[in-house]
């Protein structure tokens, strides 16, 4: 299983190819590709590359799916014995990213879909030989 730990907007996320994640709002239009360069760790199934603090030459390629707003969080402030109450709501602006690939030193790390595709190609070659 291939995964990476990336830092974006002051938070760290464990990301895998083919999955989507909600991060703080990015100034990128939907359907555009972004490259996340702050990669802290890369695991490609066999080896683990740990950065000091970042992994050299590692990037994560993602596509912006959409911009959305998170669930409403209610903030309630009250001063006892003063009849002072303040109720406020907040919805965080988010961007949904689909992780396309994890690149390490210019080469794409294996994704979960690639081994299955390789096996399907090998099965087709065996069938065509028979």
Curated annotation (Swiss-Prot):
GO terms under biological process: translation
Stretch list, region Disordered: 110-130
Classification via SUPFAM superfamilies: L21p-like (SSF141091)
Signal peptide span: none
A GO molecular-function annotation: structural constituent of ribosome
Subunit-level organization: Part of the 50S ribosomal subunit. Contacts protein L20.
HAMAP family in UniProt: Ribosomal_bL21 (MF_01363)
Family recorded in the similarity comment: Belongs to the bacterial ribosomal protein bL21 family.
Protein's recorded name: Large ribosomal subunit protein bL21
Originating gene: rplU
């Amino acid at each position: 299983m291939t995964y990476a730990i990336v830092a974006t907007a002051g938070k760290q996320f464990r990301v895998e190819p083919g999955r989507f994640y909600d991060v703080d709002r990015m100034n990128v239009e939907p359907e555009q590709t972004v490259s996340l360069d702050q990669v802290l760790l890369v695991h490609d199934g066999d080896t683990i590359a740990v950065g000091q603090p970042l992994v050299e030459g590692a990037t994560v390629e993602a596509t912006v799916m959409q911009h959305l707003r998170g669930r409403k969080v209610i903030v309630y402030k009250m001063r006892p014995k003063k009849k002072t109450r303040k109720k406020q709501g907040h919805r965080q602006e988010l961007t949904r990213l689909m992780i396309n690939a994890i690149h390490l030193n210019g080469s794409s790390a294996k994704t979960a879909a690639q081994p299955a595709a390789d096996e399907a190609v090998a099965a087709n070659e065996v069938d065509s030989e028979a």
